[in-house]
Amino acid sequence: MRDLAYLKLLSREYPNIRAAASDIINLQAICGLPKGTEYFFSDLHGEHEAFIYLLRSSSGIIREKIRETFGHIISEEDEVRLANLIYYPEKMINQIKQANEYTEDWQKTAVYRLVQICREVSSKYTRSKVRKKMPKEFSGVIDELLYVDNTDDNKTEYYSELINTLIDVQVADSFIVAICSLIRSLTIDNLHILGDIFDRGPRPDIILEELMHFHDVDIQWGNHDISWMGAATGNRACICNVLRMALGYNGFDVLEDGYGINLRPLSMFAERVYRDDPCTCFLPQILDKNIYDAVDPKLAAKMHKAIAVLQYKAVSYTHL
């Protein structure tokens, strides 16, 4: 009876033999493709610049694909520029525009090279899977450019017109950003984050923002991450703990710029209570300089001590 129930459920998706056979053929063929690349990162600890570079460069895989695709056709300098364009397309396009190098020739060359790289990195996936990863606004154009044989005399003009029209209607820069995103997406099929995203590093919030835009990621939370979750729910001990950790490592940027936490009441309180105490044991460990909110280390030490004492009190209250 249970088998009959399962068969009835399957019949909704596969109403006849042809439908079932078609899917079996497709799944069996997929088993013959190489497995998608999986990346494991552990203990990020808020080091956003290193993490984002490794993620966007696929730990050097993209540079390797450029070398495999173009060999000695392009110079090493052009390889580096193409790689950086894929990693940080918006930033590189702005730099090229400022240098007055954003010409039609540059756009055509960039689009052509990016399409070749995209073909290379998409070769291990089915067309269906590649389509699912394509940015919606350019999915039709990218699909045509990837799978049209531009060496076919009947399609050469068509291929060229696709690229020319992108430039004529002034969406080449948006297209470049989109196909660069697709390339990065195809070089990493699954992303696994193990351990702490938060800790003593400067900007864990930027790491989270980057992960929110990633297509397939799973996270094993660490103890520092749990503390931030507790703080977000309003637990006073957790709030004090995350503030203490950030202040102890000079992490004012993540608090004030990243999450908009107003530290002025704490600084005024600490200045008043510890005005005659240098709090030298609580001086912050300056691993990274604050970009947006530079705070005098002496004041930071007083704030650090104040929040530490408040944390001990908050923890004691939770056990009463």
What are these regions (language model features)?
Residues 54-60, 207-211, 232-243:
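Short secondary-structure boundary/capping segments
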Residues 318-319:
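Conserved small/polar residues in nucleotide/adenosyl-binding loops
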Residues 43, 196, 223:
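Divalent metal-coordination and catalytic microenvironments
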Residues 23-35, 180-190, 203-213:
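A short acidic-Thr-Gly-centered motif at the start of a beta-strand
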Residues 70-97, 229-285:
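Extended charged low-complexity segments that act as oligomerization/scaffolding linkers
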Residues 47-48, 199-202, 224-229:
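Active-site environment of divalent metal-dependent phosphoester hydrolases
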Residues 96-180:
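Low-complexity, highly charged intrinsically disordered N-terminal segments
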Residues 17-124, 293-297, 305:
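N-terminal low-complexity, Ser/Thr- and acidic-residue-enriched intrinsically disordered segments
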